[in-house]
From Swiss-Prot:
Name by which UniProt lists this protein: Coiled-coil domain-containing protein 43 homolog
Record field: compositional bias (Basic and acidic residues): 112-126, 175-212
Family, as annotated: Belongs to the CCDC43 family.
InterPro entries: CCDC43 (IPR037666), PWI_dom (IPR002483)
Matching Pfam families: PWI
Superkingdom of the source species: Eukaryota
UniProt keywords, alphabetically: Coiled coil
Keyword Coiled coil: yes
Positions of region (Disordered): 102-126, 159-222
Segments of skewed composition (Basic residues): 213-222
Length: 222
């Protein structure tokens, strides 16, 4: 219940006291119900209230009825204004939602639009020349307009990586082979040195034995 509706009820109660008649809440609600009845026009309302009050008091109720109609008209006007405001706000909210949805759809479309087509003619020429120079199979750009490598270039990169990897493996294999060869050469040299030492030791042993034999022969002669 609005503030003005409460004030109207208070006015009815006060007026009934002035009429020196029943001012109970039941009577107040009854009169308030008549004045609020949207199915009746103002004349019908005045007639109904006047007839009711005539059964309760002999005092003239014309001014009272007119004042109630004026106050009730203000209540109706306030409600209509409030409803119009609600409808206006609702319409604005709906328009805002539609606008936001439309803008969102536009943003999505712009997001997936190829930036290449937004370039100037000169920018397109430069881009095409770049694509041709580096042998791209197809032109493609991301959302920022940067070139995305085609499958051909990706494959070439993979092949280059494989070649580099293969070269690395070959270099490792050569290094290992060289190390093994160096070990074999070292072992061979060490073996030759050992053979030479053994040979020299054997020759020395033979010389010593020959020397001993010679000494023995000399002793026998003596």
């Amino acid at each position: 219940m609005s503030r003005k509706e409460k004030e109207l009820k208070e006015y009815i109660e006060k007026s009934l006291k002035e009429f020196e008649t029943d001012d109970s809440s039941m009577v107040v609600e009854y009169i308030f119900g008549i004045i609020s009845d949207s199915s009746s026009n103002d004349d019908e309302k005045k007639e109904s209230i006047s007839e009711f009050l005539e059964s309760l008091t002999e005092k003239d109720s014309t001014s009272f009825c007119n004042e109630m109609l004026i106050r009730h008209k203000e209540i109706i006007d306030d409600k209509e204004t409030e409803n119009k405001l609600k409808l206006t706000n609702l319409k604005l909210e709906q328009e805002l939602k539609i606008k936001e949805t439309t803008q969102s759809e536009i943003n999505e479309e712009e997001k997936y639009e190829n930036p290449y087509h937004k370039m100037s003619r000169e920018e397109q020429k430069k881009r095409d020349a770049l694509l041709s120079k580096y042998g791209y199979d197809e032109e493609d750009v991301d959302e920022n307009g940067d070139i995305i490598l085609s499958d051909h270039i990706e494959k070439k990169k993979i092949e280059d990586n494989k070649i580099e990897s293969g070269l690395g493996e070959n270099l490792n294999a050569k290094r290992i082979a060289d190390e093994e060869k160096a070990k074999r050469e070292k072992s061979k040299i060490e073996h030759q040195k050992k053979v030479q030492r053994d040979k020299e030791a054997l020759e020395k042993q033979k010389r010593d034995e020959e020397k001993k034999k010679t000494v023995k022969k000399e002793k026998r002669r003596l």
